[in-house]
Amino acid sequence: MKQPKHILVIRFSDIGDAAIAVPVLRCLLQQNKNLQVTVATKSFLTPVFETVEGVCVTPADIRGKHQGLKGLVKFYAEIKNNGFTEIADLHGSLRSNVIKVLFRLKGVRNKTIDKGRLEKRKLINGTNFSQLKSTAERYADVFRKLGYQVDLSNHVFPEKPQLPAKVYTILEKDAKKWIGIAPFAFFDSKMYPIDLMEKVIAHFSKTQHYKIILFGGPKDEKELIRLSESYSNTVFTFKKLSFSEELQLIPHLDLMVSMDSGNGHLAAMWNVPVVTLWGVTHPYAGFYPFQQNNNNTLLSDREKYPLIPTSIYGNKAPEDYKDVMRTISPTSVINKMEELLNT
């Protein structure tokens, strides 16, 4: 019997990028038989990839024992005898290049993502303001170059995971619909002003028909506490649920509201409707949540701020662009949310 191919998939970071890879890996395994897939990623992203049936994860401690060149060589030594026949590099970073070079010495072939840097540069400088290939398609192209069929249009969403019992320590068992709101972003230029988001939260909290579940991280804790104490029917998950438990909760949301950030992609993994709010970045760069309706996008006013997108990741923006997201009215956010909640 022919031995199965064994692909080492490399994607070390970040949450959003990892989440985008999930439906691609599902399609890869659904559409190609006799195939093993192992993902090398940061330890904390392990639960994201473990949602894909048939995928193994080999976590890399790139801030610890696998840090630097010496650490990457150690990581290679730990996994080199796992029978990998090819490598799909979805990251295209210095770290992934080191791993590929070491495996190439063993005769393991590899293919690497084309990030479309030139196209993205033209998008930012305004010479080509048009839709670029999605990141999911760029990931799929890597596997296609290795000879595999990956048709994202035939993706099949799996059944929702079972809700952990712990969820009901923060959420009551009632008939309320669950709205996830991830109001924060790594860069301020991608974050909807909190005073405007509060108007959205206030509207839905007072109806008594919804439970608002806020998502955030360590630096957001004080604001999460303040918001949950200021508005009824509003809770947060940080420190109350583990990341794995959050991943089990998200598929059960009726709606997710997110910036151009990871939580929107985590919800899209499970076909949860996602309303995305965009600041100085733009969905044309290819980071739109997987298979979400384009009408669920709320964009900052490009007529008033014509340099949008000022960067791909939101890390660069002119000083006078700090208020771009104030051109998205709370009313427009509320209307879009109600449209989806009542569909």
Q: Where is each model-derived feature located?
A:
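Catalytic machinery of carbohydrate-active enzymes
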Residues: 1-343
